[in-house]
UniProtKB/Swiss-Prot annotation:
Organism name: Helicobacter pylori (strain ATCC 700392 / 26695)
Name by which UniProt lists this protein: Uncharacterized protein HP_1429
Domain of life of the source: Bacteria
SMART domains: CBS (SM00116)
Family: Belongs to the SIS family. GutQ/KpsF subfamily.
UniProt-listed GO biological process terms: carbohydrate derivative metabolic process; carbohydrate metabolic process
Length: 329
């Protein structure tokens, strides 16, 4: 099917319409509004063990779930409640000190209107996001932020586009205010995202990734040939020279191997003659991965050999492991 219109022109118009709505919404925060009162309300709720319950139906339900996810990721207790399910038992999830945010662009959603009276009966404070303070829903609520827009960005001015973008943005406004009020830090964020890059930088330690088995350990008297076999089998690009007490003596790196081959060293030669003796080693297993990476890059080595206070080999960590995690010094 041929496309008989300019996709780029539509893309430009959609983004301009949505950007304009966001900029116009700034105006509501340049005159008296409920934002500060809402932030204080949520903070007081949290102090008393409560949470922010966010309600929406249709597209607003999906936006509500995203706002819940953002709140949780920044240390703010939150939960999504579907209004229909609430009327059939899920209302029990709304606890004594909870605050409720109800999202409805038009503010006339019957599902939400039916739920409001039950929430008010239980003495819950209601925040509303709608297009007008005169909507039925906002009249029943206690606090209000505006979703007013000039038009939806879709070609027929009907599908939720600009309105859902603005709703997401207002959710971000609440989240940002709560973060600032609680002095939420990068360390706090990382604690809620241990699997993310920041979490790895701030929380994962050397001992958490240390390889302690199947190590390429060889004696200083090992032949060049046998050392190459050991390096090939263990796939770390190096071999570790240890004495009978398992104390670190040296490291045979791939660079040592290349230099030996260029010099024509016999495969029968003992590796102690051309390996790196008294290599750099690492003792602090409680160090963060970023510190380990900085150590490797500072000394221009690829294998972090970890030893105890008696210089006995405990395990290794390879530079590639850290780089694969996305770490950068």
């Amino acid at each position: 099917m041929p496309i008989l219109f300019d996709c780029n022109a539509i893309a430009s118009q959609v983004l301009k319409d949505e950007a304009s709505a966001l900029l116009e919404s700034v105006g509501q925060f340049q005159k008296p509004n409920d934002l500060e009162a809402i932030v204080k309300l949520i903070l007081k709720s949290q102090e008393n063990g409560g949470k922010l319950v966010i309600v929406g139906v249709g597209k607003s339900a999906l936006v509500a779930q995203k706002i819940v996810a953002s709140m949780l990721s920044t240390g703010n207790r939150s939960a999504f409640l579907h209004p229909t399910e609430a009327m059939h038992g899920d209302l029990g999830m709304v606890e004594k000190n909870d605050v409720v945010l109800m999202i409805s662009y038009g503010g006339e959603s019957l599902e939400l209107l039916n739920l409001v009276s039950h929430l008010k009966r239980l003495s819950h404070k209601i925040i509303t996001f709608t297009k007008s303070p005169n909507s039925s829903l906002s009249k029943l609520g206690d606090y209000y932020l505006s979703l007013k827009i000039q038009k939806e960005a879709c070609p027929i001015n009907t599908a939720p586009t600009t309105s859902t973008t603005l709703t997401l943005a207002l959710g971000d406004v609440l989240m940002a205010c709560l973060m600032r009020a609680k002095n939420f830090s990068q360390e706090d964020f990382a604690s809620f995202h241990p699997g993310g890059l920041l979490g790895k930088k701030l929380f994962v330690k050397v001992k958490d990734l240390l390889q302690t088995t199947n190590l390429p350990l060889i004696a200083p008297s090992t032949s060049f040939k046998d050392a190459l076999i050991e390096m090939s089998e263990k796939r770390l690009g190096s071999a570790i020279l240890v004495n009978e007490a398992n104390e670190l003596v040296g490291v045979l790196s791939d660079g040592d191997v290349r230099r030996a081959l260029l010099k024509g060293v016999s495969l029968k030669s003992e590796v102690r003659h051309f390996a790196t003796l008294k290599p750099k080693s690492f003792k602090n297993l409680d160090a963060l991965l970023l510190e380990a990476l900085e150590f490797l890059e500072r000394h221009k080595i690829q294998l972090l050999v970890c030893v105890d206070d008696h210089n006995k080999v405990l395990g290794v960590l390879h530079l590639h492991q850290l780089l694969e995690l996305g770490l950068k010094a």
